[in-house]
């Protein structure tokens, strides 16, 4: 019978080559499985896969109980997925997760979103940096053009940072004004880019960088070394531009995604359409954006609450 390490290798290989999961997902799966393996070693449990039972899993759950609920859910889900795979492949006789109920309550935090004024401030600052350096030759000016294209596309499409970082040149159709992204579960979706300024930003970036993009292997957004612009680099440029635009709170690419969805909902766009744009498998995931901000709430209650239609004589209201 195999040990946990050997089973982890089999499972990760299955996830990569048969399920086609992203490198990011595989990375976190690997981290979670290694942590579980280390837990067994430190606590002198057998690493033989057949020796792992419900009691071992409960002890492991207790050992990670101080982590954030979302992190705990992911770690347990990773291990459960491995055991389900082993059961399906007939590598184990008993799956310890069978008839084992694990409930992890996760606080329902509202998404961190920007209002339209904050988005506009970031856009204006980013374009200003380009104008300030238009007379400067070299990479500095080109970098500003790239940064504008990145921020415009984040807000125009609501894509995930991983989807933007891995966007291929062949999937950017500037003639038909659309992009094709590969999201979670290797699922592809097409998103139209309809805003004139966003289109202009992409076209200007591509005209300047297209030869380097081809030399760099076909990834659309590249760095100064003609390599893929990493997720971390995108996060850094977004945070930097937001901070220099005068926004003190932490702004990330995912905040742009949240803001994209929330602001569309506030414009009464159908939630099912937003679900497709975001690449959510379930509409339950999209429904987190149905929260309403204070100003919108105030407007709705002022204009639409039925109390405004009540006619009560003044003498009844006299004190």
Model-derived regions, located:
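Conserved catalytic core of the tyrosine transesterase superfamily
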Residues: 1-319
């Amino acid at each position: 019978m195999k040990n946990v390490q050997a089973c982890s290798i089999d499972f990760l290989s299955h996830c990569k080559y048969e399920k086609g999961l992203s490198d990011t997902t595989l990375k976190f799966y690997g981290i979670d499985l290694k942590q579980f393996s280390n837990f067994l070693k430190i606590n002198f449990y057998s690493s033989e896969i057949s020796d792992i039972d419900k009691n071992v899993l409960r002890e492991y759950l207790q050992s990670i109980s101080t982590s954030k609920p979302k992190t705990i859910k992911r770690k347990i889900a990773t291990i459960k997925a491995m055991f389900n795979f082993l059961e399906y492949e007939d590598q184990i006789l008993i799956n310890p997760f069978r008839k084992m109920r694990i409930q992890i309550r996760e606080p329902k935090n509202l998404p961190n979103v920007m209002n339209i004024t904050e988005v506009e401030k970031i856009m204006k600052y980013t374009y200003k940096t380009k104008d300030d350096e238009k007379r400067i030759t070299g990479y500095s000016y080109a970098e500003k053009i790239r940064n504008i294209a990145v921020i415009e596309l984040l807000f125009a499409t609501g894509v995930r940072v991983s989807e933007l970082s891995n966007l291929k040149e062949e999937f950017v159709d500037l003639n038909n004004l659309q992009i094709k992204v590969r999201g979670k579960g290797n699922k592809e979706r097409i998103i139209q880019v309809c805003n004139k300024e966003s289109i202009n930003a992409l076209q200007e970036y591509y005209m300047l960088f297209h030869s380097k993009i081809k030399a760099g292997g076909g990834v659309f957004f590249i760095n100064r070394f003609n390599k893929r612009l990493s997720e971390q680099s995108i996060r850094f440029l977004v945070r930097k531009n937001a901070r220099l635009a005068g926004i003190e709170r932490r702004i990330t690419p995912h905040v742009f995604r949240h803001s994209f969805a929330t602001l569309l909902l506030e414009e009464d766009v159908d939630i099912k359409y937003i679900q497709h744009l975001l690449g959510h498998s379930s509409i339950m995931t999209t429904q987190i954006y149905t929260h309403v901000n204070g100003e919108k709430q105030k407007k709705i209650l002022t204009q639409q609450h039925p109390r405004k239609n009540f006619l009560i004589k003044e003498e009844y209201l006299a004190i």
